[in-house]
Amino acid sequence: VVAVVGFLFSALPMIYLHLASIGRLSPVSHTISDYIFLTHGGELLALSAVSLAVGSAALLRVILAVGVPRGGPVQVLFSVWCLGLLLAAVFPTDPLGSETSLPGAVHRYAGLAMFVSLPLAGFLLSVRFRESLAWSGAAIVVRRLSMVSAAVSVLFLLSHVPIVFSNGKGDEVLSGFLVQGLAERLLFGSIFALLGALLLGARTALRRVEEVVPCP
């Protein structure tokens, strides 16, 4: 329940900010983090990130309760994902075309850590799921979505190349080359799909475990 509520409260502010930014920010060239420059954008982005972190932590708790070892790489990677979300919420991004500040650098590397960690965690879980009867139905879906998320994550990182080589000279240098906003939205779509698959798989696995274990 906590995971579902967390994911819901993460998605709703994003939907609102996308609608509120129509005509002001480009979904192709501006990242989701740029919504901080909208009215109440910072608060809504923080709500979305914290809710996603809470939902992910609740999902991890269920996953650990049905067969995945505690303290292993999956738990570490999920923790990196959640910590990255919180850091990205606390440290805002820099305006497009400006020089990188310390908070902006923290935001960027927090994003790098979280976008690498979750697809890798999903892939490791899919390997683990193939060995478990309770999770067997989710293994293939989680594996494929993890690979898609990893591929789109690489695309998102590559989309920042024009920004790196712009040397802070302004938006006009980058005109026609910025697609990191589109890449990030595709990435978040694949990540939400991965988290949804894990959530459904966890629900099924928990039910199977309860059916096997007799009531006292």
What spans do the regions from the language model cover?
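Interfacial segments of alpha-helical transmembrane regions
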Residues: 1-5, 67-80, 136-150
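Alpha-helical transmembrane segments of multi-pass membrane proteins
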Residues: 7-26, 160
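Perimembrane loop-to-helix junctions flanking transmembrane segments
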Residues: 26-40, 176
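Interfacial helix-start motif at the membrane-water boundary
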Residues: 34-54
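Internal transmembrane alpha-helix with an interfacial aromatic "cap," most often the third helix
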Residues: 50-78, 119-133, 199, 205
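Hydrophobic alpha-helical transmembrane segments of integral membrane proteins
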Residues: 76-104, 156-166
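Membrane-proximal helix-loop-helix units in multi-pass membrane proteins
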Residues: 87-138
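Terminal transmembrane helical module of multi-pass membrane proteins
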Residues: 127-208, 215
